[in-house]
C-alpha cells in the first residue's frame, strides 16, 4: 500500500482508496503544481502578489493623474500608445520594451491631478512586427470596450477612469454565507425581461434581483459578463477578459448590481471562461503581437475544432499571470464571490473530451491524455482563491467525472468546491424524448441522481441554459409543446397534456432538488416552465429577439397556469431553507418500485414519496421510515395553489408501526396520488 501523505498529493487516497494504482500520477501532478508555485514564490513574491497583475499591467493612473501603460507583446519590434487623446499619433507616445517582452510608456498629467487621457475615450496599442508591418490592437487588460454596429462589429477599446463622484462605492463586502447549501439562479442579464431588446444591468438590479430573492435562491450565477463580440455566443467566445460587457451598461452599473445582490443576502458567481478564447484578432487577444503563440499554443494544439476558438498555453508564466489576475480582478473590482469555470473537461484533457465517452474507469483520468499544465493552472487558481477569499465558491463544469476534482489542493485534489452534475439533465431529456411514462425506470432515475463521488460536492439541476438552446427546448416545452400556446390559461380546459406537464415539471424539479446533490441550479425562467427555447439575434433568424428574452409577464398574468409552477419553486426553495437537505448526508432510498413507479427516500429528517405512475393512485401505501413518531404533511405538489387536484388531506396525521419495512425500522401508510410528491415530517 502507498503511504498516504498530505505533502505529496496522495492525501486523496484517504477518501478514495481506489486511487491507489494511480498514486504515481497523483504525485507527479502535485509535484508539477509545487514546482510552478515555487517559481512564482521565488520570482513574484508569492501567488497572492502574482495574481494582482491587473494592478501593474494595462492602464494604471497614479496619484498625480499620470497614466502608465504596460503590455506583454514580445514579438513586436516597436510599440506606441495611440488614441483620441493624442489624435491617434504614432509618434507622441512611444513605448519601451523590457527583457521579458513587456512594453511600457508613461503619459504625464496635463497639470497636477489632471489625467491626460479623457475618461471613456478610445485607445489602442499600435505595434510594428518583424517584416515591418504595423498592427493595431485593443489593450489586453482593457476594462471597457464598446461596439457601434452602425460603423463596424469590431469593438473599440475605451479608457475607463470616471471622476470620483461618478465611481460606484460599494456598501457591502463579499458574501460571507457558507459555501454549503447553494440554491443557484443561473442568469443572463441581456435576456432578463420580456422586451425584444437587450436588458440592462440597472433593469436586472431593479426588476430581477427581488424575484430571485423571493423565489428562495441564495446565489446568482451570472453568464456573459466577460466581454464577447458575438452576442449569440451566449458569452462563451470571450474577446476582452477584463471588460464587463458594455451591451448591458457601464462597469459602475455592474458594481451596483453586485452590491444590491449582496444587500439581499445573495452570493454572486461569475461564469468565467478560461477554457478558450475568441479567435478574433482586431478586438480579441488572438495573434496579438503578430505571433500565433502569445497566449495560446501554436498550430493545431492551440485551436479547438468544435468551438472554432483559441486554446491557452497554461504552461507559460505570463499566461498564468493573465488568467490568475483575471480571477482576482473580478473578485476585487466587482466583488464577485466566486466562479463557475466553463469547459473544464476541455481544459483537463488533450483530446478536450471530444470522442471520449468516459466509462468511469480511473485509467481515463490519468496518463498521457491528461493536460498536466491545465491541471496545474486549475490547482493554482483554486489555491489562490481559497487562500485569499475564505468564502469563495468555485464550481467546475466537467462531464468526465474526474476523481479528486472537488478535493482540496493540499490533499492532492484540484480544489473546486462543486462540480456540475451534467448527466442529470441529459437523463430527463432522454426520458421525455424516447420513452413513454410507463417505461420510466425508477432505479435508473435514482441511480443518475445519486451516482456522485463520495465527499465531492455536486450541483444538481434538471435543466440549464444548455438545454434551452436552439435545437433543443425547455423541459416545459418537451412536456407540453404546442399546447402551451392555447391551454395555459385557467379559462381554457385542463387538457391531459397540460395536466401531465404541470405535474411532471414539479416532480422532476423537486426530485432533483432533494435527491440529486449538495447544491441546486435553475436557469432563469425555468422556475415557471418557460416555453420554447433560447435563440439570440443572428443572421439566421433575421436578428430577432423573440427567443432572446425571458417572459416574466407570463407569471404576472394571474389567469395563466405558469403561476402554479412558479409558486412551487418558491415553496421548495424555502422548504430547503428550513430543513437544509442540501447540507445533509445523501438520502437513504428505501424504495424504487418499478411496477408502482414509486420512489421513497429520507433526507434531513423528511420522508419523500414520489409517485410517477401516470394513472395509478395508491390507498394505504406502506412505506418504510427509520424514525418512529407521528408524521404530518409538510408539502405536496397536488395542492391547488400549485395547480394540483387537492387529493391529499393537508391536516392528515400518519402514525408509524414499529415493524421493519424496506430496510427501515418502522412503516406508515399513506394515500399516494398519481404524478404527485408527498413530503412528510415529524
UniProtKB/Swiss-Prot annotation:
Enzyme class: transferase
Catalytic function, reaction form: Transfers a segment of a (1->4)-alpha-D-glucan chain to a primary hydroxy group in a similar glucan chain
Chain sites annotated for binding (1,4-alpha-D-glucosyl)n: 88, 124
Residues annotated as catalytic: 342 (nucleophile), 397 (proton donor)
Enzyme Commission number, as recorded: 2.4.1.18
SMART domains: Aamy
Gene Ontology molecular function: 1,4-alpha-glucan branching enzyme activity; cation binding; hydrolase activity, hydrolyzing O-glycosyl compounds
Pathway: Glycan biosynthesis; glycogen biosynthesis
UniProtKB keywords: Cytoplasm, Glycogen biosynthesis, Glycosyltransferase, Transferase
One Pfam match: Alpha-amylase
Phenotype when the gene is knocked out: Disrupts production of intracellular glycogen.
GO cellular component: cytoplasm
Alphabetized InterPro entries for the sequence: A-amylase/branching_C, Branching_enzy, Glyco_hydro_13_cat_dom, Glyco_hydro_13_N, Glyco_hydro_b, Glycoside_hydrolase_SF, Ig-like_fold, Ig_E-set
Site (Transition state stabilizer): 466
TM region(s), chain numbering: none
Domain of life: Eukaryota
Subcellular location: Cytoplasm
GO biological process: glycogen biosynthetic process
Family assignment from sequence similarity: Belongs to the glycosyl hydrolase 13 family. GlgB subfamily.
Function of the protein: Glycogen-branching enzyme participates in the glycogen biosynthetic process along with glycogenin and glycogen synthase. Generates alpha-1,6-glucosidic branches from alpha-1,4-linked glucose chains, to increase solubility of the glycogen polymer.
Protein name: 1,4-alpha-glucan-branching enzyme
Lineage: Eukaryota, Fungi, Dikarya, Basidiomycota, Agaricomycotina
Gene name of the record: GLC3
Amino acid at each position: 500500500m502507498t503511504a498516504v501523505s498530505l505533502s505529496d498529493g496522495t492525501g486523496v487516497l484517504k477518501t478514495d482508496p481506489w486511487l491507489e494504482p494511480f498514486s504515481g500520477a497523483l504525485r507527479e501532478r502535485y509535484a508539477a503544481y509545487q514546482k510552478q508555485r515555487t517559481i512564482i514564490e521565488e520570482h513574484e513574491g508569492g501567488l497572492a502578489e502574482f495574481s494582482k497583475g491587473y494592478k501593474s499591467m494595462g492602464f494604471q493612473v497614479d496619484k498625480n493623474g499620470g497614466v502608465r501603460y504596460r503590455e506583454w507583446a514580445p514579438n513586436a519590434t516597436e510599440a506606441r500608445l495611440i488614441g483620441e487623446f493624442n489624435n491617434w499619433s504614432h509618434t507622441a507616445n512611444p513605448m519601451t520594451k523590457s527583457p521579458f517582452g513587456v512594453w511600457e510608456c508613461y503619459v504625464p498629467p496635463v497639470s497636477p491631478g489632471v489625467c491626460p487621457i479623457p475618461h471613456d475615450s478610445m485607445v489602442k496599442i499600435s505595434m510594428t512586427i518583424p517584416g515591418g508591418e504595423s498592427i493595431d490592437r485593443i489593450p489586453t487588460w482593457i476594462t471597457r470596450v464598446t461596439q457601434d454596429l452602425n460603423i463596424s462589429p469590431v469593438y473599440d477599446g475605451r479608457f475607463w477612469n470616471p471622476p470620483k463622484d461618478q465611481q460606484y462605492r460599494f456598501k457591502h463586502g463579499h458574501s460571507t454565507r457558507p459555501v454549503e447549501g447553494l440554491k443557484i439562479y443561473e442568469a443572463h442579464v441581456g435576456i432578463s425581461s420580456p422586451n425584444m431588446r437587450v436588458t440592462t444591468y440597472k433593469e436586472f438590479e431593479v426588476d430581477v434581483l427581488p424575484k430571485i430573492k423571493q423565489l428562495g435562491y441564495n446565489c446568482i450565477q451570472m453568464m456573459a459578463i466577460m466581454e464577447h463580440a458575438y452576442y449569440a455566443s451566449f458569452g462563451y467566445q470571450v474577446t476582452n477578459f477584463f471588460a464587463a460587457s458594455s451591451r448591458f451598461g457601464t462597469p459602475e452599473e455592474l458594481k451596483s448590481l453586485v452590491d444590491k445582490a449582496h444587500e439581499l443576502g445573495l452570493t454572486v458567481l461569475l461564469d468565467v471562461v478560461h477554457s478558450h478564447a475568441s479567435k478574433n484578432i482586431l478586438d480579441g487577444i488572438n495573434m496579438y503581437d503578430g505571433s500565433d503563440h502569445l497566449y495560446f499554443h501554436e498550430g493545431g494544439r492551440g485551436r479547438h475544432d468544435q468551438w472554432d476558438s483559441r486554446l491557452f498555453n497554461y504552461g507559460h508564466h505570463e499566461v498564468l499571470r493573465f488568467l490568475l489576475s483575471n480571477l482576482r480582478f473580478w473578485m476585487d473590482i466587482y466583488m464577485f464571490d466566486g466562479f463557475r469555470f466553463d469547459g473544464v473537461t476541455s481544459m483537463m484533457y488533450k483530446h478536450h473530451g471530444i470522442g471520449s465517452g468516459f466509462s468511469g474507469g480511473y485509467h481515463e483520468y490519468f496518463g498521457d491524455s491528461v493536460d498536466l499544465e491545465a491541471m496545474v493552472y486549475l490547482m493554482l487558481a483554486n489555491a489562490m482563491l481559497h487562500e485569499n477569499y475564505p468564502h469563495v465558491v468555485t464550481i467546475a463544469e466537467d462531464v468526465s467525472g474526474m476523481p479528486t476534482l472537488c478535493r482540496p489542493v493540499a490533499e492532492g485534489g484540484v480544489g473546486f468546491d462543486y462540480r456540475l452534475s451534467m448527466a442529470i439533465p441529459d437523463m430527463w431529456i432522454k426520458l421525455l424524448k424516447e420513452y413513454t411514462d410507463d417505461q420510466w425506470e425508477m432505479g435508473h432515475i435514482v441511480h443518475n441522481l445519486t451516482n456522485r463521488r463520495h465527499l465531492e460536492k455536486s450541483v444538481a439541476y434538471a435543466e440549464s441554459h444548455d438545454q434551452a438552446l436552439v435545437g433543443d427546448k425547455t423541459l416545459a416545452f418537451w412536456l407540453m409543446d404546442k399546447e402551451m400556446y392555447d391551454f395555459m390559461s385557467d379559462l381554457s380546459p385542463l387538457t391531459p397534456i397540460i395536466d401531465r406537464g404541470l405535474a411532471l415539471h414539479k416532480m422532476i424539479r423537486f426530485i432533483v432538488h432533494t435527491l440529486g446533490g449538495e447544491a441546486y441550479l435553475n436557469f432563469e425562467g425555468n422556475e415557471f416552465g418557460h416555453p420554447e427555447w433560447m435563440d439570440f439575434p443572428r443572421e439566421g433568424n433575421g436578428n430577432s429577439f423573440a427567443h432572446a428574452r425571458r417572459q416574466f409577464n407570463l407569471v404576472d398574468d394571474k389567469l395563466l397556469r405558469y403561476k402554479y409552477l412558479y409558486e412551487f419553486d418558491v415553496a421548495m426553495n424555502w422548504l430547503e431553507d428550513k430543513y437544509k437537505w442540501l447540507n445533509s448526508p445523501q438520502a437513504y432510498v428505501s424504495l424504487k418500485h418499478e411496477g408502482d413507479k414509486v420512489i421513497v427516500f429520507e433526507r434531513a429528517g423528511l420522508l419523500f414519496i414520489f409517485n410517477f405512475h401516470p394513472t395509478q393512485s395508491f390507498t394505504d401505501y406502506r412505506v418504510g421510515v427509520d424514525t418512529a413518531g407521528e408524521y404530518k404533511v409538510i408539502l405536496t405538489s397536488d395542492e391547488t395553489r400549485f395547480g394540483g387536484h387537492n387529493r391529499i388531506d393537508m391536516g392528515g396525521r400518519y402514525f408509524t408501526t414499529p415493524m421493519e419495512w424496506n430496510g427501515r425500522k418502522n412503516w406508515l401508510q399513506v394515500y399516494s396520488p398519481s404524478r404527485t410528491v408527498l413530503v412528510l415530517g415529524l
